[in-house]
């Protein structure tokens, strides 16, 4: 599988995963969509940086893949965090990074 298709596959999984947290309640869903959009913007920024770095020969494709996946999944724990505690505050809930690690281990995207 080529690198672009691999990242697109992860993006598709991410979209389906996030959709599971939508409830139909506009106020709740606005918070979920905020984090979805944020994660995709971070991925877009990472794509621009990675593209330049790979073209310049300062980043290999393995590192590029890691950077893109890190960008996409950096807030993956936020969705469970918000569903359970209705907050994105780690201080008022749980560490979203650790929660995200659990999500990725359980889901294996």
Q: Where on the chain are the PLM-derived regions?
A:
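Membrane-targeting and insertion segments and their boundary/processing signals
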Residues: 12-16, 71-74
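Active-site flanking loop/helix segments enriched in acidic
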Residues: 13-44, 79-90
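Alpha-helix capping and helix-coil boundary motifs
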Residues: 2, 25-27, 95
